[in-house]
């Protein structure tokens, strides 16, 4: 009897689950980064599948900048309660005391202090030797050249010229004390794969991904949702209610919405099949400077 061939999504699922299980077996203190977005939701689902019917054998970590959408935080807490995983949260208190924010200090400094430095603080605090991330190679050019097992030195820095070969899905997890590995089990997935898998597996995601009427401010052509009263209005800013959704999620002042009628998973998938724009075009942090994502990763960002 001929063996049953796996579908494209089943192959991706199997590869990711194998990576997650291998890290859990190989490392002494792994953690899964949980940014609450669609990729994190898929990665969480895969981790639950990998160890079912048992619990996920490592904690999930959310680095909270204090500027996430309120719906994201509510969703995070609801997911932790529903699935019973261990949720760790960390905020860079030094940044909070300094009043660091995207409006007062700019996107680059805010991202460095509240996200990159906050992440490194959390990794040092708990002594994690491996950290799962939901990055995919199709997202951005610096991520396209990153390994599944991405080696980081004792300062959490990434050197793209010092990467280990990964032949025949064989991964090298050897690290010295203080060093660590960032692991990307979704490396070979595309944005369309993510949405099709969410649809296939009926994975719950933050409602912000679905089109709905929302209060936004047009800032230089970017539609920024006014999520609270901390966003100052400047000359030329135009407030309105538009039918929009988010293709990617981050800190609300640094994440632009897009006009859309896609209010179901089927419509989002149809939109993905027709779009020719970058997934991260709404992430303002990517336009801070030339090669900004690679610079952030060299400094310790995911």
Swiss-Prot record:
Top-level class of the enzyme under EC nomenclature: transferase
Transmembrane segments: none
Ranges where the record places region Disordered: 280-302
Claim: Membrane is one of the keywords in the record: no
Annotated metabolic or biological route of this protein: Sulfur metabolism; hydrogen sulfide biosynthesis; sulfite from sulfate: step 1/3
Xref: InterPro entries: PAPS_reduct_dom, Rossmann-like_a/b/a_fold, SO4_adenylTrfase_ssu, Sulfate_adenylyltrnsfr_sub2
Matches recorded under Gene3D superfamilies: HUPs
GO molecular function: ATP binding; sulfate adenylyltransferase (ATP) activity
Assigned keywords, A-Z: ATP-binding, Nucleotide-binding, Nucleotidyltransferase, Transferase
GO BP terms in the entry: hydrogen sulfide biosynthetic process; sulfate assimilation
EC number: 2.7.7.4
Catalysed conversion reaction: sulfate + ATP + H(+) = adenosine 5'-phosphosulfate + diphosphate
Family: Belongs to the PAPS reductase family. CysD subfamily.
Function text: With CysN forms the ATP sulfurylase (ATPS) that catalyzes the adenylation of sulfate producing adenosine 5'-phosphosulfate (APS) and diphosphate, the first enzymatic step in sulfur assimilation pathway. APS synthesis involves the formation of a high-energy phosphoric-sulfuric acid anhydride bond driven by GTP hydrolysis by CysN coupled to ATP hydrolysis by CysD.
Subunit-structure text: Heterodimer composed of CysD, the smaller subunit, and CysN.
Name of the protein this chain belongs to: Sulfate adenylyltransferase subunit 2
Biological source species: Shewanella frigidimarina (strain NCIMB 400)
Protein encoded by which gene: cysD
